Amino acid sequence: KSDSNKFPIISEIWLNPLSFLKKAAFSRSFCLVPFPGSRYPNFMIERILLGAPTFLIAVPQLVDPNFFRSVVLLVEHSDEGSMGIVVNRPIELEIGEFCASQDMTFNGDATQPIFQGGPVQTDRAFILHESEQEGPETETVMGNIRLSYSLESLSMLVEEPPEHLKVFLGYAGWGEGQLAEEVTTGAWLVAPADVQLIFQSNPDDVWELALHQMGIDPLQLMHSGSVH
């Protein structure tokens, strides 16, 4: 008798990987665990799992200092490449100080931190905010969550800041096929984006909370070698 009946999920991965990935994409969360001889190629990951908006959750073995224990909101993904914002990496710069350096006044809690959004274009500001405001260089990410990427947009938002607003310097970028390769090699877990985690008041908790939402104990992931 075939052992596939004992392990129906593993059997489905091997016998019908496309069907399995489609089901996974619509589940509450999904953890892609690669293994030798995997039959799901990168194009399946590209088309089914990596549609924005999505959370990319770094595994503990990802030791790149730009992404160690990071949670990335994937905001754009196409055949040409991908763009994301690291949502849980505050830096020692307050939003009031940053706005003052740009000749603006922040009319909200000026002590909240600026965040490092990624290693690309770190001199450029990106603003995630929950509002109905349609401003210049602003795109809808999900629901009322919008991403603005110009100082003109920021100048409009700081006058009457919405309850949920975070400012990031830089973004995370991947070239053609690069992100899918990193996912299949086990550097990232993939999960649906969660608005509450994006604007979580304590960014130090975001990584563990994101894993717990997937039903994963972080300690269970800490027993293998590093991923670069």
Language-model-derived ranges and their functions:
Residues N5-I9, I13, A25:
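Residues flanking N-terminal targeting/processing segments that define the start of mature chains
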Residues F20-S29:
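Positively charged N-terminal leader segments that act as targeting/secretion signals
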Residues D3-N5, N16, Y40-N42:
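Intrinsic-disorder-associated, low-complexity terminal segments enriched in Asp/Asn/His/Tyr and depleted
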Residues M44-H228:
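A short aromatic-anchored loop/beta-hairpin motif
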